[in-house]
Amino acid sequence: MGQVLPVFAHCKEAPSTASSTPDSTEGGNDDSDFRELHTAREFSEEDEEETTSQDWGTPRELTFSYIAFDGVVGSGGRRDSTARRPRPQGRSVSEPRDQHPQPSLGDSLESIPSLSQSPEPGRRGDPDTAPPSERPLEDLRLRLDHLGWVARGTGSGEDSSTSSSTPLEDEEPQEPNRLETGEAGEELDLRLRLAQPSSPEVLTPQLSPGSGTPQAGTPSPSRSRDSNSGPEEPLLEEEEKQWGPLEREPVRGQCLDSTDQLEFTVEPRLLGTAMEWLKTSLLLAVYKTVPILELSPPLWTAIGWVQRGPTPPTPVLRVLLKWAKSPRSSGVPSLSLGADMGSKVADLLYWKDTRTSGVVFTGLMVSLLCLLHFSIVSVAAHLALLLLCGTISLRVYRKVLQAVHRGDGANPFQAYLDVDLTLTREQTERLSHQITSRVVSAATQLRHFFLVEDLVDSLKLALLFYILTFVGAIFNGLTLLILGVIGLFTIPLLYRQHQAQIDQYVGLVTNQLSHIKAKIRAKIPGTGALASAAAAVSGSKAKAE
């Protein structure tokens, strides 16, 4: 029992208020500053069977004795503000004070779980029997249990400044309160054990911008520690009722941002079943009701709270679909000159714009007929003179209107003159690449045919030129060109109007040609099997059609 005195000397450092209770003289000395030492000795003699002097002298119990006495003494105000009250400078631990100690010291020591724990092996307060991996969690549970006991002892409405009984007289009325407090602590411990198998990274407290480190001086405005506050179970039940319906289905990838009263942004990342939701609600309730958590950052790591900065916004990928519509209808600049020209030629051949297609068709036919009867030099000179006569006439007409003060004399072709015909570097590179690729492709094909890289292809080309010799004897080149222009402006339009019939006739012609090819190959030695296979394939295609 010789180690009891340092405990009380250590607890003497807590701030105390003047007590209106008359001093107890039973078992104490009038000149002593520790007037309740006799009471503490009697208390420890009664419980000598349950605890030993070794349990009283451990560093962990000394720490909890100091915290418990500090929290109970300051019951006149808020517990969070009392816990942050600075220690007086220049005073030793064992220096006595002039003020009277609180008469509820025995009751306070009774309410400390660490001082009345059982020496049974396997109890969570015994650090020797707990595995090394579970000791941080056991320390956390002991602190949470102790804080729950202090909160209930503070909220029971018994102020030490108005108490008029000695610790021995208050010992019997406090028995029901101790039972209720013990049951509440066991229930909180059970809920924390249920939430233990979840992932440790459930909550991520983020400091709000401008808050910096956790501000310990910011009190919680929602709950007062000196009021008659009930147990913490209603708050936990409300949290469980709120998340109760979500226990039936797993939650994937949800992020809930909530800002608590201390300007922390708590972001629970829930990637599992409803057990993690339960753990989230429990930890939020404990954090809001136990302000020491804001003063102990290591506890955040122990229960899965990790300080982290704001998450950078996810970049959004935006794709511009420039060719969602046709270039002509949407007015978007063409990606390549060939695609733009191809669309315009298709519009002309399908007569989408009747006026434009008619003008182009008429101009081409007149030019070709002129070339048919005259030389190309004379035709080009006459066309150039006709164009110049038209433009010069319009220009002179505008000048005459300006001379008679009826016009501004502007060039009628100024809009065309303002058109920018220069090519950008990208367009020049694109055009040069297209021209180069086409020239190289043409040269490769000519080499393939004329240097007999493939004998069959070279024979086909020879047959084509042989047929053209007969065509050239009958038709002129300009005549063939005129027929080609007429076919380009008429065949696509007719095919669109009579597509079904044309497809049927084209299929019949294709089948006949395939039969003819098969007969020719059958007469060539060594190609009989190939000819029969080709004939079978062509026959099956004809039947299917």
From Swiss-Prot:
<dbReference type="GO" id="GO:0005882">
    <property type="term" value="C:intermediate filament"/>
</dbReference>
<keyword id="KW-0523">Neurodegeneration</keyword>
<dbReference type="InterPro" id="IPR003388">
    <property type="entry name" value="Reticulon"/>
</dbReference>
<feature type="compositionally biased region" description="Low complexity">
    <location>
        <begin position="157"/>
        <end position="166"/>
    </location>
</feature>
<dbReference type="GO" id="GO:0014069">
    <property type="term" value="C:postsynaptic density"/>
</dbReference>
<comment type="function">
    <text>Inhibits amyloid precursor protein processing, probably by blocking BACE1 activity. Enhances trafficking of the glutamate transporter SLC1A1/EAAC1 from the endoplasmic reticulum to the cell surface. Plays a role in the translocation of SLC2A4/GLUT4 from intracellular membranes to the cell membrane which facilitates the uptake of glucose into the cell.</text>
</comment>
<feature type="compositionally biased region" description="Basic and acidic residues">
    <location>
        <begin position="32"/>
        <end position="43"/>
    </location>
</feature>
<keyword id="KW-1133">Transmembrane helix</keyword>
<dbReference type="GO" id="GO:0014802">
    <property type="term" value="C:terminal cisterna"/>
</dbReference>
<keyword id="KW-0472">Membrane</keyword>
<dbReference type="InterPro" id="IPR046964">
    <property type="entry name" value="RTN1-4"/>
</dbReference>
<feature type="transmembrane region" description="Helical">
    <location>
        <begin position="463"/>
        <end position="483"/>
    </location>
</feature>
<dbReference type="GO" id="GO:0007420">
    <property type="term" value="P:brain development"/>
</dbReference>
<keyword id="KW-1003">Cell membrane</keyword>
<dbReference type="GO" id="GO:1902430">
    <property type="term" value="P:negative regulation of amyloid-beta formation"/>
</dbReference>
<dbReference type="GO" id="GO:0005783">
    <property type="term" value="C:endoplasmic reticulum"/>
</dbReference>
<keyword id="KW-0703">Sarcoplasmic reticulum</keyword>
<feature type="region of interest" description="Disordered">
    <location>
        <begin position="199"/>
        <end position="250"/>
    </location>
</feature>
<dbReference type="GO" id="GO:0030182">
    <property type="term" value="P:neuron differentiation"/>
</dbReference>
<feature type="transmembrane region" description="Helical">
    <location>
        <begin position="368"/>
        <end position="388"/>
    </location>
</feature>
<dbReference type="Pfam" id="PF02453">
    <property type="entry name" value="Reticulon"/>
</dbReference>
<keyword id="KW-0206">Cytoskeleton</keyword>
<feature type="domain" description="Reticulon">
    <location>
        <begin position="345"/>
        <end position="545"/>
    </location>
</feature>
<comment type="subunit">
    <text>Interacts with isoform 1 but not isoform 3 of SPAST. Interacts with BACE1. Interacts (via first transmembrane domain) with ARL6IP5/GTRAP3-18. Interacts (via N-terminus) with SLC1A1/EAAC1; the interaction promotes cell surface expression of SLC1A1.</text>
</comment>
<keyword id="KW-0225">Disease variant</keyword>
<keyword id="KW-0890">Hereditary spastic paraplegia</keyword>
<keyword id="KW-0256">Endoplasmic reticulum</keyword>
<feature type="modified residue" description="Phosphoserine">
    <location>
        <position position="229"/>
    </location>
</feature>
<keyword id="KW-0812">Transmembrane</keyword>
<feature type="compositionally biased region" description="Basic and acidic residues">
    <location>
        <begin position="135"/>
        <end position="146"/>
    </location>
</feature>
<dbReference type="GO" id="GO:0043005">
    <property type="term" value="C:neuron projection"/>
</dbReference>
<dbReference type="GO" id="GO:0005789">
    <property type="term" value="C:endoplasmic reticulum membrane"/>
</dbReference>
<dbReference type="GO" id="GO:0033017">
    <property type="term" value="C:sarcoplasmic reticulum membrane"/>
</dbReference>
<dbReference type="GO" id="GO:0009986">
    <property type="term" value="C:cell surface"/>
</dbReference>
<keyword id="KW-0963">Cytoplasm</keyword>
<feature type="compositionally biased region" description="Low complexity">
    <location>
        <begin position="14"/>
        <end position="25"/>
    </location>
</feature>
<protein>
    <recommendedName>
        <fullName>Reticulon-2</fullName>
    </recommendedName>
</protein>
<keyword id="KW-0597">Phosphoprotein</keyword>
<dbReference type="GO" id="GO:0046324">
    <property type="term" value="P:regulation of D-glucose import"/>
</dbReference>
<keyword id="KW-0622">Neuropathy</keyword>
<dbReference type="GO" id="GO:0065002">
    <property type="term" value="P:intracellular protein transmembrane transport"/>
</dbReference>
<feature type="modified residue" description="Phosphoserine">
    <location>
        <position position="44"/>
    </location>
</feature>
